[in-house]
């Protein structure tokens, strides 16, 4: 029975991870005694390897956020505007079908709004 439950947990984790291009999820932690703990940890690409979300730099976190939102948007067929704060730290922003609103620090004395046409 324990082996069946472990295999089922792995299959669930694999099916969820298959929906994400680069983000990987750890949903279960196998215990020494054969038990299983529920967890929900995201691992994202950063510097050529996968690291926990909290250990990644801002650019990696922003792009992982976009990827997660893209997958959920596609699944539910709902595309809402995305707001990204601290985006001045991101050189390459992941593509999205949603409207993307980038908030960036500026030395300008007045609020400035710049628009770009969708590609």
Predicted regions and their residues:
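Charged, surface-exposed helical/loop "interaction arms" that form contiguous linear patches used
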Residues: 1-43, 48-52, 77-79
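Short beta-turn/strand-loop junction motif enriched in small, turn-promoting residues
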Residues: 25, 69-71, 89
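Glycine-rich/acidic phosphate-handling loop/turn and adjacent ATP-lid/helix
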Residues: 51-59, 90
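GG-anchored amphipathic helix commonly corresponding to the ABC/SMC/Rad50 NBD signature/C-loop
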Residues: 59-81
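Walker B catalytic acidic pair
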Residues: 85-87
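Conserved ATPase-coupling elements of RecA-like P-loop NTPase cores
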Residues: 90-96
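C-terminal lobe/lid and adjacent interdomain/linker elements of RecA-like ASCE P-loop ATPase modules
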Residues: 97-119
């Amino acid at each position: 029975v324990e082996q069946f439950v472990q295999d089922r947990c792995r299959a669930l984790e694999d099916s969820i991870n298959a929906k994400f291009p680069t983000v990987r999820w750890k949903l279960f932690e196998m215990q020494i005694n054969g038990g299983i703990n529920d967890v929900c940890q995201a691992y994202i690409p950063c510097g050529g390897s996968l690291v926990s979300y909290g250990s990644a730099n801002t650019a990696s976190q922003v792009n992982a956020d976009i990827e997660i939102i893209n997958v959920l948007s596609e699944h539910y067929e709902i595309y809402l505007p995305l707001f990204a704060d601290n985006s001045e730290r991101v050189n390459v922003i992941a593509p999205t079908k949603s409207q993307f609103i980038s908030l960036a620090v500026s030395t300008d004395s007045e609020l400035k709004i710049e628009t770009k046409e969708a590609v």
